[in-house]
Amino acid sequence: MLQSIKEASVQPALVIVYFGGNDSMHPHPSGIGPHVPLPEYIENMRKIALHLKSLSPTTRIIFLSSPPINEQQIKETLSGKFGRVNRTHEDCRVYSEACLQLCYEMDVNCIDLWTALQQRDDWLTTCFTDGIHFSPEASKIVVKEILKVLREAEWEPSLHWKSLSTEFSEDSLYDPIGPDAKTTINVSDMDVERHMQWE
């Protein structure tokens, strides 16, 4: 599959890679489960980065580090469903730091989700639905961090939404009505002063 992607005539402009949370779980005594030992996780992430870098000189890459978890919430919401949940906050930190270090060495943009989510004083109670999976509030933090990278990265062309040109601009009956009350105004390329949630 990876080879067919590499041979495709059109390569992705942006790839966001997010692994580490499940990998950081403790190994189950049965030998099954999602645990990936730290050295193997690092090597897998290195291979993913090298593959993505080989796709095209214009394919941009952002890795997301392993986020924190709320161990107490996991015990309260998931222990009855999955038995003993072998995941700790500290293990997530170790995998997060490993991802950040690898990305630094490979010159790949990486978002430190471990730190970003914990910037909120109430992160333990607002960032998760079950101690692991993101709530809408946590998802907003992730989007904000991704947009920050897109805005600040010195990529040519820039991939930040405000710098992208309008490719399919056309007049529409649904555009605002002009001052003459007979025509519409194409707002596709208007520079409007406003504050938007996703600046």
PLM feature spans:
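Alpha-helical cap/lid subdomain in secreted, periplasmic
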Residues: M1-E199
